[in-house]
């Protein structure tokens, strides 16, 4: 399906989610969780691919593994810059062992929230509700 640049993706009226994680097993697990919450997932394995995806399409939410925080930081800055005048996707980051300074910087750079792994469906749903992606 060919879409015009900047078009928000909706599949059967589902919210779209860009999931970025290098680990295919983790992407599969999170896709199942996010799909169970009513989101249609597009998977990418790195920030560069995620940036290209966001340039071509406008997901409603981005859920991103942030262990390589320099890439996550660059991703947040580019998404913020490219979407100055349009709706930005909500970005939620997660990591195994985030340091508090990096978490704070990510929030300042535009991330809606930060999760510590491991997390379950209930916590993910709560964070998506808090960010305004899902209804309460």
Locate the predicted segments by residue.
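Two-component/phosphorelay signaling modules centered on CheY-like receiver
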Residues: 24-42
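Alpha4 helix (beta4-alpha4-beta5 surface) of REC/receiver domains from two-component response regulators
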Residues: 73-74, 97-113
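The C-terminal output helix
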Residues: 129-136
């Amino acid at each position: 399906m060919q879409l015009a640049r900047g078009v928000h993706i909706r599949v059967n009226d589902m919210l779209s989610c860009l999931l970025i994680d290098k680990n295919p097993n983790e992407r599969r697990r999170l896709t199942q969780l996010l799909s169970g919450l009513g989101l249609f997932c597009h998977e990418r394995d790195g920030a560069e691919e995620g940036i290209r995806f966001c340039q071509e399409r406008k997901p409603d939410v981005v859920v991103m593994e942030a262990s390589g925080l320099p890439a996550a930081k660059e991703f947040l800055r580019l998404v913020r810059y490219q979407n100055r005048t349009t709706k930005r996707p909500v970005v939620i980051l997660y990591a195994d062992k985030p340091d508090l300074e990096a978490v704070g910087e990510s929030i300042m750079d535009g991330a809606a929230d930060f999760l510590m792994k491991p997390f379950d469906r209930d916590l993910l749903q709560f964070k998506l509700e808090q960010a305004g992606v899902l209804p309460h």
